[in-house]
Each structure stands twice: as structure tokens, then as C-alpha cells.
């Protein structure tokens, strides 16, 4: 499943910005009460990226049967993935909590659009993205709380 591997590799590139910000700056922030320990994020994102890769594969294999909807779905997926990586760059790399909140808001909307577009091609692909939407919803709440507290 090349799609899973590619999504994992591209997704892991956001860890560069995360690692940059996890030093003294992040440690100095007032943390929301519901913020999980830092070690939780790696395994969760690894699982989510694998699920995203599986969803991409399901859509990709339908590209000849449904070229218009599949191409649209993959394009929207690519757009949301750019915003996923941008959030790490803005929140951790640039240390801009408020701007991160704006980015994650756009990301959330693009994930909803991706789920809708994937559902038009393969319902299973859309379902595979639901945990991702739930996690980003939680991450947006955390981002908001970091913004309020700091």
C-alpha cells in the first residue's frame, strides 16, 4: 500500500516543525486541563496517517471508474493535507497560537469537504477519515484553549 507509506512520510514531515516547538517555548505555555501527554501524539498521528493513506488508496483505485469525482476528492485531500502541515509550521514552527487557530479552522472545513468528496467515490474511504476529523476537532479545541490561556 504505497498510498499509506506516502501519507505517512509526508505527514511525518510536519514533525520537523513540531520538534522545533516542543522545547522551552511549548513547555512554558499554560496547558489546557484536557491536554494529553506529549507521547500520545506520535502514535495517534501514525494511526491517523495510516487511515488517511488507506482512504486515499480506496479513492485512487476508482480513478478510472469515476475520474471526475475521484480527481476532485484527491485534490481536496491534497489541499487539506497542505493545511495539516501548515498548522504544525504555524503553531510550533512560528509559535503563533492565534494564527494556528485560523489554520486549523480551515483544515477542519477541508477535512469535512474531503469526507464528502471521498463519500461520492467510496463510502469506506469517507468512513476512514472520521477519526481524523474527530482528532482535529479535539486539536482545534486544544488550540483554542492554548490561545485563551496564553
Predicted stretch roles:
Residues 139-150:
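Juxtamembrane boundary at the C-terminal end of a transmembrane helix
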Residues 74-87, 101-114, 132-136:
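Hydrophobic alpha-helical segments of small multi-pass membrane proteins
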Residues 36-51, 94-107:
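Membrane-interface loop-to-helix entry segments
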Residues 1-5, 67-78, 125-133:
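Interfacial segments of alpha-helical transmembrane regions
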Residues 20-34, 65, 149:
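Membrane-interface helix termini and inter-helical loops of multi-pass transporters
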Residues 91-96, 113-126:
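Membrane-helix boundary connector in multi-pass membrane proteins
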Residues 1-17:
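N-terminal signal-anchor transmembrane alpha helix
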Residues 50-88:
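Helix-adjacent hinge/juxtasegments
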Amino acid at each position: 500500500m504505497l498510498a499509506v507509506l506516502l501519507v505517512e512520510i509526508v505527514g511525518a514531515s510536519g514533525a520537523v516543525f513540531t520538534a522545533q516547538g516542543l522545547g522551552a517555548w511549548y513547555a512554558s505555555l499554560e496547558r489546557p486541563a484536557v491536554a494529553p501527554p506529549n507521547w500520545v501524539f506520535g502514535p495517534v498521528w501514525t494511526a491517523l496517517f495510516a487511515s488517511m493513506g488507506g482512504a486515499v488508496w480506496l479513492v485512487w483505485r476508482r480513478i478510472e471508474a469515476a475520474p471526475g469525482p475521484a480527481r476532485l476528492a484527491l485534490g481536496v485531500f491534497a489541499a487539506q493535507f497542505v493545511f495539516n502541515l501548515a498548522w504544525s509550521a504555524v503553531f510550533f514552527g512560528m509559535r503563533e497560537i492565534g494564527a494556528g487557530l485560523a489554520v486549523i479552522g480551515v483544515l477542519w472545513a477541508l477535512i469535512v469537504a474531503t469526507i464528502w468528496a471521498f463519500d461520492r467515490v467510496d463510502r469506506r474511504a469517507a468512513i476512514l477519515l472520521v477519526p481524523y476529523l474527530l482528532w482535529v476537532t479535539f486539536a482545534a479545541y486544544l488550540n483554542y484553549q492554548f490561545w485563551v490561556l496564553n
